[in-house]
C-alpha cells in the first residue's frame, strides 16, 4: 500500500462534456476546460458546424493537452508528441503518459470517460449483468460475491459455489471444454444486454445444481449483507462489515439494505472495541463516502485533524494549501470509537480503501490481514 497523498493526486480521469468540453471526475480536481476554437487544432474543420468541431477528435485532444499540462502530477515528465499523429484522445493520452505507464507510477489511473459513465460507476455502481463476481485458480472458478439486488442472488447463487459448466445455447460445456475451444468471456457469459440468458452448473455442498439466470440492470448494495456482531466469551463482541465499494448507496441505500451509519450505530450500541472491515474486493469510489466513513470511525478520537489532503502538482500551490481540499475528522451522531480495526485486503483493494486505512492509522490501532493492497 502506498501513502495516499501522492496516490490520489496521480489519478486523472478526463471527462468529456458534450464531446468537446470538460469537467472534473470524482477522483481529480476539476480542471478548467479549454475553448475549442475549431481552427488551429490540427484537424480538418471545413464544412463542419461549430458543434461538430467542438465534438471532434481534434478538440478532444486539445482538451487532453490542456488538462494534462496543467493538472497531471508528473506534468514535467510527459512525452512531447505531435497531436496530429493520433486518431483518438485516448491514444494521444497514452502516448503522452508512456514514461509514467512504463515505470508503473500511472497504473491505468488516467483515462478518458464520459459524465454518464463516471457518475454511474462512482455513484450507483449500476451495470447490466448476472450479479455475481468470480475468482479463478488454474482449473476452477468460484463465486466470491453475489449481489443481493441481482438476478443471480434471486436464483439462489451464493458465495463459495463452484462454477463447473455453462450452457451457452447448445448444451452444457465444462470449463475444460470451453478452454479447449478457446471460448471468449463474451461467448461464455454473453454480451452486457438485458435479457441475455445463460444456464450455469454449480457445485454446492458436494452436489451439482443447475441454475438459469437472465442478465438485468442492477445496482449492487454497497454493503455485502448485514453488519455482524461476533460474540466472544467474557468480552464485548467483534464488529464485522464488508464494504464492496465507496458509492452513494453506502450512505443512502435502497430500502431494505444497510448503510455505514447503520453499521456503526449497531457497533456503538454493542460497545464494540474491535472491528473487522472487509475491503478484499473494494477498488475504491467516492472520496466523500471515504470521508464520511472515517468520520464514523474516528470522528470523536481525531476531531478537527486532517484525514486526507488532495495534493496536485507544484503549478497550483493555492490549491494544495486550500483547506477546502482537505478532509477533516468530524464527529457524527453515529460515530463510534473502535480501539482496533483489522482490514482484510487483497491486490484488488485500492484507492478510497487505501485512503481510509491510511487516514485512520494515526488515530486507531490498524492492522492489515491478507494480501498487499493495489
Model-inferred region functions:
Residues 356-357:
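Secretome/extracellular-domain signature
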Amino acid at each position: 500500500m502506498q501513502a495516499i497523498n501522492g496516490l490520489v493526486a496521480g489519478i486523472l480521469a478526463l471527462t468529456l462534456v458534450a464531446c468537446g468540453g470538460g469537467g472534473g471526475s470524482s477522483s481529480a480536481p476539476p480542471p478548467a476546460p479549454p475553448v475549442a476554437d475549431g481552427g488551429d487544432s490540427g484537424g480538418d474543420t471545413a464544412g463542419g458546424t461549430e458543434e461538430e468541431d467542438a465534438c471532434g477528435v481534434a478538440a478532444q485532444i486539445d482538451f487532453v493537452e490542456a488538462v494534462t499540462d496543467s493538472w497531471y502530477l508528473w506534468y514535467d515528465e510527459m512525452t512531447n508528441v505531435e497531436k496530429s499523429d493520433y486518431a483518438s484522445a485516448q491514444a494521444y493520452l497514452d502516448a503522452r503518459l508512456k514514461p509514467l505507464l512504463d515505470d508503473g507510477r500511472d497504473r491505468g489511473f488516467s483515462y478518458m470517460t464520459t459524465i454518464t459513465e463516471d457518475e454511474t460507476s462512482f455513484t450507483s455502481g449500476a451495470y447490466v449483468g448476472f450479479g455475481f463476481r468470480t475468482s479463478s485458480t488454474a482449473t476452477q472458478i468460484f463465486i466470491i460475491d453475489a449481489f443481493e439486488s441481482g438476478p443471480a442472488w434471486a436464483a439462489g447463487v451464493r458465495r463459495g459455489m463452484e462454477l463447473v459448466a455453462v450452457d451457452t445455447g447448445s448444451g452444457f460445456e465444462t470449463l475444460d471444454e470451453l478452454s479447449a475451444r478457446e471460448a471468449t468471456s463474451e461467448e461464455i457469459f454473453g454480451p452486457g444486454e438485458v435479457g441475455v440468458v445463460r444456464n450455469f452448473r454449480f457445485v454446492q455442498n458436494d452436489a451439482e445444481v443447475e441454475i438459469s439466470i437472465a442478465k438485468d440492470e442492477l445496482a449492487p448494495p454497497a454493503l455485502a449483507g448485514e453488519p455482524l456482531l461476533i460474540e466472544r466469551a467474557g468480552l464485548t463482541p467483534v464488529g464485522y462489515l464488508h464494504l464492496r465499494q465507496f458509492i452513494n448507496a453506502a450512505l443512502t441505500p435502497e430500502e431494505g439494505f444497510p448503510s455505514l451509519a447503520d453499521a456503526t450505530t449497531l457497533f456503538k450500541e454493542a460497545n464494540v472495541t474491535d472491528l473487522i472491515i472487509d475491503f478484499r474486493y473494494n477498488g475504491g469510489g467516492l472520496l466523500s463516502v471515504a470521508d464520511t466513513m472515517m468520520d464514523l470511525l474516528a470522528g470523536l478520537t481525531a476531531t478537527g485533524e486532517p484525514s486526507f489532503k488532495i495534493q496536485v502538482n507544484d503549478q497550483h500551490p493555492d490549491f494544495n494549501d486550500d483547506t477546502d481540499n482537505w478532509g477533516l475528522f468530524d464527529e457524527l451522531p453515529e460515530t463510534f470509537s473502535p480501539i482496533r480495526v483489522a482490514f482484510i485486503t487483497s491486490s484488488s483493494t485500492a484507492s478510497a480503501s487505501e485512503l481510509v486505512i491510511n487516514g485512520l492509522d494515526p488515530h486507531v490501532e490498524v492492522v492489515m490481514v491478507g494480501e498487499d493492497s493495489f
